[in-house]
C-alpha cells in the first residue's frame, strides 16, 4: 500500500482486502457528521490494521460471460457479453474530477448540500454545506472510504459479423475458402455504480504490480 491506503494481509480475510481511513459511524452503521456538516474520520472501526480500517475488497462477487454465435446462410454473427458484479476500487481519477468540479455530477454549485448521516447527539444531519466542501472538502480531503467505489460493470466485449464467400466464386482462384469479417471490441460498458459524468471504466483501474484495484 501507499499513503493511508493499500492492500493488507489480514487473518481470515481475502488477500484483496483494502485498508484506509474510514468514515466514523454509529453502532448501527450510520455515518457520523461533525459540527461543520462534514463526515468524521474514524480509523478504529471494523478491522483495525496499522491504525486503518477495512474499506473494501477488490475481489468481485462473481464474473459471468455470455457468448453466442448465430449463422444464417453464409453470414455469421458472434458476440461476447461480460458482467463483473461486485468488488471495490479506489479511484484518484474520479476523486479529482468530482473534487475539482470537472464533471456534470457537480452541477448547481450554488445549491446547499446536506450529507446523509447523523450528528453526535444521534439526530439526523441538518447541517448545510456548499458544493466545494461537499466534493473537495470531503471527497479529496476526507476519509479514504469516500474515494472507494463499487467496481461492478456490464460490458459488450466483442461483436463480429462474418460473410463466407461462396466457393463457386473461388473456382478460378487459388483459394479454397475466403471470408470477410468486421469486428469490434469493447463497444459498450456501464459501470452503473460510479458517478455517471466520470465515464469511468473499471477495466483501466490498477495499482501496478499487486492485488489492488
Model-predicted regions and their roles:
Residues 70, 79-83, 180-186:
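Transmembrane beta-barrel strands of outer-membrane/channel proteins
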Residues 45-54, 59, 107, 111, ...:
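Extracytoplasmic loops and strand-loop junctions of Gram-negative outer membrane beta-barrel proteins
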Residues 72-75, 175-177:
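Strand-connecting loop/turn motifs
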Residues 74-79, 168-169:
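Repeated loop/turn-to-beta-strand initiation elements of outer-membrane beta-barrel proteins
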Amino acid at each position: 500500500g501507499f499513503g493511508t491506503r493499500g492492500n493488507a494481509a489480514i487473518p481470515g480475510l481475502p488477500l484483496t482486502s483494502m485498508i484506509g481511513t474510514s468514515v466514523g459511524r454509529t453502532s448501527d452503521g450510520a455515518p457520523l457528521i461533525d459540527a461543520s456538516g462534514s463526515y468524521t474520520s474514524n480509523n478504529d472501526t471494523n478491522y483495525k490494521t496499522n491504525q486503518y480500517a477495512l474499506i473494501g475488497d477488490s475481489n468481485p462477487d462473481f464474473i459471468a460471460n455470455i457468448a453466442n454465435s448465430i449463422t444464417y446462410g453464409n453470414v455469421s454473427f458472434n458476440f461476447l457479453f461480460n458482467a463483473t458484479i461486485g468488488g471495490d476500487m479506489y479511484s484518484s481519477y474520479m476523486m479529482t474530477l468530482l473534487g475539482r468540479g470537472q464533471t456534470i455530477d457537480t452541477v448547481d454549485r450554488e445549491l446547499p448540500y446536506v450529507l446523509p448521516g447523523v450528528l453526535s447527539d444521534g439526530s439526523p444531519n441538518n447541517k448545510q454545506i456548499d458544493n466545494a466542501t461537499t466534493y473537495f472538502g470531503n471527497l479529496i480531503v476526507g476519509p479514504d472510504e469516500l474515494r472507494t467505489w463499487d467496481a461492478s460493470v456490464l460490458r459488450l466485449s466483442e461483436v463480429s459479423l462474418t460473410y463466407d464467400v461462396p466457393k463457386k466464386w473461388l473456382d478460378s482462384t487459388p483459394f479454397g475458402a475466403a471470408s470477410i469479417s468486421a469486428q469490434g471490441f469493447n463497444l459498450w460498458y456501464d459501470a452503473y455504480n460510479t458517478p455517471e459524468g466520470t465515464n469511468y471504466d473499471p477495466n483501466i483501474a490498477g495499482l501496478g504490480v499487486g492485488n489492488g484495484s
